Regions:
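Asp-based, Mg2+/Mn2+-dependent phosphohydrolase catalytic module
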Residues: 9, 26, 30-133
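Short, acidic loop-to-helix structural element flanking the phosphoryl-transfer center
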Residues: 1-20, 26-30
């Protein structure tokens, strides 16, 4: 995914805590991410088979669990999502949601997600926010 590595590395060097919240199992994620060692910068992961997880996406629990483990408020978290269930989960948790899609969010989704077609847009916004405040 274009700009993913730059976004993760920027967060890492800036000291921004990160979590990977996924419906995939630990084994599936290990397989999918093996070719991308830069993902090891993400210090926390909540997998679909996490033993503490009682409900998966679209329930808000995966994002709430990640925020709890990072010791931050979910409302201070930026969630990047590419699925309806993930978007619904992040919105219900109170995260600020960025939907990665070529099409805008459907009207039935609550909250105020931003639809972008590239993580480059998210990176630019993050840099802008971190340099302005």
């Amino acid at each position: 995914m274009p700009f993913a590595q730059k976004l993760v590395e920027h967060c890492d060097t800036s000291g921004i805590p990160m979590a990977l919240v996924t419906s995939s199992s630990l084994d599936a994620v290990a397989f999918k991410t093996a070719a991308h060692p830069w993902l090891n910068c993400i210090q926390l992961r909540v997998h679909g088979d996490d033993p503490e997880l009682r409900a998966g996406k679209p329930d808000p629990e995966p994002f709430l669990l990640a925020a709890q483990r990072l010791a931050v408020n979910a409302s201070d978290c930026w969630a990047m999502e590419d699925s309806r269930a993930g978007t619904a989960s992040a919105l219900a948790a109170g995260c600020q949601v960025w939907v990665l899609s070529a099409e805008p969010c459907t009207a039935d989704q609550q909250g105020n997600p931003r639809t972008v077609d590239s993580l480059g847009v998210v990176l630019d916004q993050l840099i802008s926010v971190s340099t302005s405040g």
